[in-house]
Amino acid sequence: MEASSPLDPVGRLVAFCRGGVHLAVLLLFLSPSTLGQCPAPPLFPYAKPINPTDESTFPVGTSLKYECRPGYIKRQFSITCEVNSVWTSPQDVCIRKQCETPLDPQNGIVHVNTDIRFGSSITYTCNEGYRLIGSSSAMCIISDQSVAWDAEAPICESIPCEIPPSIPNGDFFSPNREDFHYGMVVTYQCNTDARGKKLFNLVGEPSIHCTSIDGQVGVWSGPPPQCIELNKCTPPHVENAVIVSKNKSLFSLRDMVEFRCQDGFMMKGDSSVYCRSLNRWEPQLPSCFKVKSCGAFLGELPNGHVFVPQNLQLGAKVTFVCNTGYQLKGNSSSHCVLDGVESIWNSSVPVCEQVICKLPQDMSGFQKGLQMKKDYYYGDNVALECEDGYTLEGSSQSQCQSDASWDPPLPKCVSQVICKLPQDMSGFQKGLQMKKDYYYGDNVALECEDGYTLEGSSQSQCQSDASWDPPLPKCVSRSNSGLIAGIFIGIIVLILFIIFSYWMIMKFKKRNSTNEKCKEVGIYLNSKEDSCVQPQSLLTSQENNSTSSPARNSLTQEV
C-alpha cells in the first residue's frame, strides 16, 4: 500500500469549495440577530410610529420615530436597533394629561383612587342619612384636544321616609307631619277620655325613628306601638319558637299561650305563659337556644367499620358494621342526644368478635377418631362420618358461616334400629298409612275402628333400642269392656256384702254372750252400753226418772 501524498492544488480547490457550500448552508439557518438585525419594534399604549411600516426585520442602526397618543402631553421620541439586535427603550417620554381637581359634593365625599390623570377614576359617596343621585364614579377621558371627567358630580339627597303608620286608639306627634327624613323621631300616645283618664295601655316602643337599610330607601326603625284595652295582652313573641296553642290578636286575662322551639333549638323556661294585667305574661317568657352539635365521633371499630353522617346535629346516627366473619357485641348504633344542655353520643363503640361455630354436644353415632376442633371460625370446614350401625343423614361436609351457622346443616347419625308393629292389628283402622319397618326417630299414628276403644296414646316414636315410646296402644272391643266392667262391679258388691254380714254376726254374738253372764250374777243389762249394772243403782235411777217416760230397752229378771 502506498502512503498518501499531500493534496495538489486541484485537491485544495475542491476541498475549499466543499467548505464554502457548508458555510453557506449554515448561514441560511442562522437567526437575524446573528446577521445584525432587529425584529419588529414593540407596541406602545401611549405612542404610535410617525411612519408606520410593515417590515418584520430591521438592520442594526435603524431608528424609528414615535409621537404620543391623545391624552398624553405631545412629544416625539425615537428608538434605535442596537448591535445586540435589541431596540432601545424609551423612558418617561409620554406623560398623561391631568383632569380638573374634583370637588366634594354637598353632604358627600369624593375619593381619588390613584390620581386624576388621563385614564384614572374617582368615586363619590354620601354621608350617613343621604342617598346619591347621579353617577357614583367618573373617569378622566379625552375630550376634544384635552381630557375631562366623563360624568358630573352627583347630588347627596336626604333619605326620605313615608308617613309613620297610624294606630287605632292613638296617634303620633311630630314637629312636621308632612316631611319625614332620615333621623327624624315620632312619638305615639294613646287616646284618653274628656277628663284625661287613661283608657288604653301603650304596648311597645313609644317612639320610632326614620332610618335606612340599603342607604337608598328610608324605613321606620320598628313597628309602631299598640293601644290595648285595659286588662288585655298582645301576642307574646319568643325568638326561634312557635305558638302551638290557639293564636289571637288580643288575649284576655288568664288566657294561656304555649310555645314549642323550632328544630335544632332547646327551650329554657316554662313552655306555657298566662296573660296578666298591664299586658304582662307570667311566668317569664321562655327562650330557645341553639343546640350544639355532637363532637366528632373519634371511636374506631377493630375488625369493622364506623359510618359517620356529615351532619352531627341532634338526632344524628352513627352506625357500626363488623367485617365478614365477625359479629357485633354491643349496640349497632350511637345517637346524638341531649344531656342537659350538652349534646353527647349515647353509646360507645361496640366490639367485633370473631364468629365461632360449635359442634353439638351430643355426638353419639359419629366416629370418635375424626380430627375435630373445639371451635371453628368463619370459613372453616368440618368432615363427619358415622360409626358402624348408623346411617348419615345430610351432607358429610359443612362450612362455618358468618352468622355462626353451618352450611349445609350438620348431618345426623341415625341408628339402623328397626321398630315393628305387632302382627295382630285387629281393631285398628285398615286405611292408616303404615309402613312395614320404622327406623329410629320415626313416628306412627294409630286409630281404632268403630266398636273399639283406644287404650294408650295414639302417637308413638321409634326409640334407639327398637322400642316404642310411649308404648303402642290397644284397640279393645266395647262389648268385652262392658262385661269386664260388670264383673268388676259385681265383685266389689260381693266383697262389701261379706264384710257387712260378718260385722252383723259378730255384733249379735257379743250381745248374747253378755245377757247370759248377767243372768248368772242376777244383774240387769243396760242396752245402751251392753254392760251389767247393780240392781240397786238401777232402781234408784228408775225412781229418779219416774216422772219421765220409762227407760227404754231395759230388761228385768226375777231372782
Curated annotation (Swiss-Prot):
Residues modified as Phosphoserine: S527, S531, S537, S554
Membrane topology: Single-pass type I membrane protein
Cytoplasmic side: 504-559
GO terms (BP aspect): cellular response to hypoxia; complement activation; complement activation, classical pathway; female pregnancy; in utero embryonic development; innate immune response; negative regulation of complement activation; negative regulation of complement activation, classical pathway
Keyword set includes Repeat: yes
SUPFAM superfamilies: Complement control module/SCR domain
Residues annotated with Phosphothreonine modification: T540
First and last residue of the signal peptide: 1-35
Transmembrane segments: 483-503
Places the protein is found: Membrane
Domain of life from the UniProt record: Eukaryota
Region (Disordered): 535-559
Main localization (coarse): membrane
GO CC, alphabetical: basolateral plasma membrane; cell surface; external side of plasma membrane; extracellular space; plasma membrane; receptor complex
Domain Sushi: 36-96, 97-158, 159-229, 231-290, 292-354, 355-415, 417-477
Intervals, Extracellular compartment: 36-482
Glycosylation sites: T53, N331
Disulfide-bonded cysteines: C38-C81, C68-C94, C99-C140, C126-C156, C161-C210, C190-C227, C233-C275, C261-C288, C294-C336, C322-C352, C357-C400, C386-C413, C419-C462, C448-C475
Keyword entries, A-Z: Complement pathway, Developmental protein, Disulfide bond, Glycoprotein, Immunity, Innate immunity, Membrane, Phosphoprotein, Pregnancy, Receptor, Repeat, Signal, Sushi, Transmembrane, Transmembrane helix
Assembly: Interacts with C3b.
Functional description taken from the UniProt entry: Acts as a cofactor for complement factor I, a serine protease which protects autologous cells against complement-mediated injury by cleaving C3b and C4b deposited on host tissue. Also acts as a decay-accelerating factor, preventing the formation of C4b2a and C3bBb, the amplification convertases of the complement cascade. Seems to act as a costimulatory factor for T-cells. May play a crucial role in early embryonic development by maintaining fetomaternal tolerance.
Family membership: Belongs to the receptors of complement activation (RCA) family.
Protein name: Complement component receptor 1-like protein
Protein's organism: Rattus norvegicus
